C-alpha cells in the first residue's frame, strides 16, 4: 500500500479529514522547500503534500502560484532538482505522502517510463497531471500502477456527467475536486451549487475526494470537511512564502507551518 492510501486509511480510522498544503517546489529556493517539508512533518501540520513542479505556463494556476513558479525558475529549479531534493528528504526520514503536480510536457520530455521510474525511486507517491486529458492518460496510468503510484485526476463544476463518470472510473489515490470554474486563487466564498456538486462527486467516487482551489481560511476548510475527505490549500501558502521570501529557510518553514496549523484547526477540533 502506498503512502497516499495508507494516509487516508489512517485518517478514516481516526475519524479525521485530510489537510493537504500545496508547496511550489523551489520557491524561493529548494533549501526553503526542504525546510518546509521537514517542518510540516515535525509539527504534524499536514497529512499529505501536493508539491508543484515549476513550469513556465501552468494552465490552471492563478497569479499567486504563477509568481511562485517564476521565482523558482529564476532560481534555476528543474524537475530533476525537485526529485533529487525529495530523494534526500526521504533518505533523511521524511514520510509525508507527496503528490507531484506536474505538467505533462515535463513528464514526456525524459520519457514517461523514465520520469515515473525516477519519481518512484525518490519516493513520490502520486502524480497530478492537469494538462493530460483522461482519454489520453492510459499509458501513464499503466506505468503509475506498476510503480504503485496514485494517478490523481481532477473534476470541475463544468465537467459533463459522462466525462466525470469516466474520470472517476480511472482515478486512484484521491479525486482532486476543483471547487470553482477557473484558476487557482484565494476567494471569499464558494460559488452557488458548491455543496450539491461536491456531494455528487463524493457519492460517485470510489476513492477519497479532496477539494482545492479558493480555500484560504479556516472556515473554508471547515465547510469542505463537512462534504469531502480533505482540503487542499495553495495560494494562501504561496502568499505566506512570498511575504517572507527574504528570510532564512527555517523562518519561512515556521511561517508556513503556523499557517497550516491555523487553517487546519477545524479538522482537529
Each model region followed by its residue ranges:
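Conserved, mostly hydrophobic/aromatic
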Residues: 21, 52, 119, 167, ...
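Active-site-adjacent beta->alpha loops and helix N-cap segments on the catalytic face
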Residues: 1-11, 30, 55-66, 74-89, ...
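Active-site/ligand-binding-proximal alpha/beta "capping" segment
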Residues: 174-181, 185-230
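Glycine-rich phosphate-binding active-site loops on the catalytic face of alpha/beta enzymes
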Residues: 47-56, 124-128, 133-136, 175-185, ...
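Glycine-rich beta-to-alpha transition loops that act as phosphate-gripper elements at the mouths
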Residues: 24, 101-109, 133-134, 155-159, ...
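Catalytic cores of alpha/beta
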Residues: 30-42, 159-169, 211, 215-231
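Alpha/beta catalytic cores of nucleotide-metabolism and tRNA/nucleoside-modifying enzymes
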Residues: 199-205, 216-226, 230-269
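Short beta-strand/loop segments at the ligand-binding rim of alpha/beta enzyme cores
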Residues: 14-20, 92-103, 144-154, 202-213
Amino acid at each position: 500500500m502506498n503512502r497516499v492510501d495508507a494516509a487516508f486509511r489512517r485518517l478514516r480510522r481516526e475519524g479525521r479529514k485530510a489537510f493537504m498544503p500545496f508547496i511550489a517546489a523551489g520557491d524561493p529556493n529548494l533549501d526553503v522547500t526542504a525546510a518546509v517539508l521537514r517542518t510540516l512533518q515535525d509539527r504534524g501540520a499536514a497529512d499529505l503534500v501536493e508539491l508543484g513542479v515549476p513550469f513556465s505556463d501552468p494552465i490552471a494556476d492563478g497569479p499567486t502560484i504563477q509568481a511562485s513558479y517564476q521565482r523558482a525558475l529564476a532560481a534555476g529549479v528543474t524537475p530533476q532538482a525537485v526529485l533529487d531534493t525529495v530523494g534526500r528528504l526521504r533518505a533523511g526520514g521524511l514520510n509525508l505522502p507527496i503528490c507531484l503536480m506536474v505538467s505533462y510536457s515535463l513528464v514526456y520530455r525524459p520519457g514517461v517510463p523514465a520520469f515515473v521510474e525516477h519519481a518512484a525511486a525518490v519516493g513520490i507517491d502520486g502524480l497530478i497531471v492537469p494538462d493530460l486529458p483522461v482519454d489520453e492518460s492510459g499509458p501513464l496510468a499503466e506505468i503509475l500502477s506498476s510503480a504503485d503510484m496514485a494517478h490523481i485526476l481532477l473534476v470541475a463544476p463544468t465537467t459533463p456527467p459522462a466525462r466525470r463518470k469516466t474520470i472517476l472510473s480511472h482515478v486512484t489515490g484521491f479525486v482532486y475536486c476543483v471547487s470553482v470554474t477557473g484558476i487557482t486563487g484565494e476567494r471569499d466564498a464558494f460559488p452557488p451549487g458548491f455543496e450539491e456538486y461536491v456531494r455528487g462527486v463524493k457519492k460517485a467516487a470510489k476513492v477519497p475526494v479532496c477539494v482545492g482551489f479558493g480555500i484560504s481560511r479556516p472556515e473554508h476548510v471547515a465547510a469542505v470537511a463537512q462534504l469531502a475527505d480533505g482540503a487542499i490549500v495553495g495560494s494562501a501558502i504561496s502568499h505566506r512564502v512570498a511575504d517572507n521570501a527574504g528570510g532564512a529557510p527555517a523562518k519561512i518553514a515556521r511561517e508556513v507551518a503556523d499557517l497550516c496549523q491555523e487553517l487546519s484547526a477545524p479538522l482537529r477540533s
